[in-house]
Regions:
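Class I S-adenosyl-L-methionine
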Residues: 1-102, 110, 207, 216-220, ...
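Glycine-rich anion-binding loop/nest that anchors nucleotide
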Residues: 2-6, 126, 153-156, 188
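Class I SAM-dependent methyltransferase SAM-binding "motif I" and its flanking Rossmann-like core
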Residues: 7, 13, 77, 81-148, ...
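A structural signal for isolated positions on well-ordered beta-strands in alpha/beta enzyme cores
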Residues: 24, 72-73, 100, 123, ...
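Short gly/pro/ser/thr-enriched loop/turn and capping motifs at secondary-structure boundaries
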Residues: 32-34, 106-110, 130-133, 158-160, ...
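Short, hinge-like loop/turn segments at secondary-structure boundaries
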Residues: 42-45, 116-120, 204-205
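Conserved beta-strand termini and adjacent loop/short-helix elements that scaffold enzyme active sites
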Residues: 49-51, 102-104, 127, 189-191
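A contiguous loop/helix-start segment that scaffolds small-molecule binding in enzyme catalytic cores
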Residues: 69-71, 144-245
Length: 245
């Protein structure tokens, strides 16, 4: 279930209902802090997970659940974006027929709104995966060369920096592939919607090469050209006809 990017204000009513009726709640510390005001620890069992222990906790809760009991696994943002590796494992453990996926407002959506760069005119990528990202890197290059905006989630890998693909790594990769980063406009959002700690950087891609950002960040490569309904022939012809009449 998605619980939004960080602020409880972005939590949906259906998500709140699911949390309240659950006996078991499993999630990462930052995500659980988003919903802590809704959790009742006197009647709900809260399980904090990490990359290392999540498998054993999912299995343990599944084995202890009784018929009619509910378990909620909240994700920051939207459960359908950048969380597929965990969701697919939960489907394996609990079974497709026993799992309901509840969408949430993602940091990608909020970043799109903050920057006024529409999703339907952008290439959206998540590098926040465990597997190979070379194909996604090619998509990134192609999108930039096609003059599309790109909204992306970078990849932090604290235990193995060689697998990092954070903002500075992305810029170095773009330069190696012949992209002029000095003219490329970018945004970086950290801790989106989180009270008092949200940050926004706006500048050129070349500025990012020596900068470090939090893993909870979104990067936008801004090549947006605004286009309204008046830019299309149908509306121009309609306006002309109205004037003539």
């Amino acid at each position: 279930m998605g619980v939004g990017p960080g602020s409880p204000q972005y939590l949906t009513c259906i998500a709140i209902d699911a949390i309240k009726k659950s006996k078991y709640i499993i999630g990462y510390k930052y995500t659980l802090e988003t919903i802590e005001s809704i959790i009742d620890k006197t009647r709900q069992e809260v399980n904090y997970v990490t990359m290392q222990n999540q498998e054993s906790i999912y299995q343990d809760v599944y084995n202890r659940m009784k018929y009619g009991e509910y378990c909620t696994v909240p994700f920051t943002g939207d459960a359908n974006f950048s969380e597929s590796e965990v969701v697919d494992r939960l489907l394996d453990i609990f079974g497709d027929d026993n799992v309901e996926i509840i969408p949430g407002i993602s940091s990608i959506q909020v970043a799109s709104s903050r920057s006024k760069i529409p999703l339907d005119k952008s290439h959206v990528l998540s590098f926040h995966v465990s597997g190979d990202i070379e194909k996604k890197k090619k998509e990134l290059i192609n999108a930039i060369r096609e003059n599309k905006s790109v909204i992306l989630i970078p990849r932090p890998w604290p235990n193995d920096p060689s697998k990092n693909f954070m903002q500075s790594d992305i810029v170095k990769f773009l330069k190696l592939n012949g992209i002029d980063c000095s003219s490329l406009k970018v945004w970086v959002f950290e801790y989106l919607t989180a009270n008092n700690i949200e940050t926004v950087f706006k500048g050129r891609a070349s500025d990012l090469e020596e900068m470090n950002f939090n893993p909870l960040s979104v990067m936008i490569i801004d090549q947006n050209k605004r286009q309204t309904y008046r830019d299309f022939d149908y509306h121009q012809k309609k306006d002309t006809k109205l004037i003539d009449s």
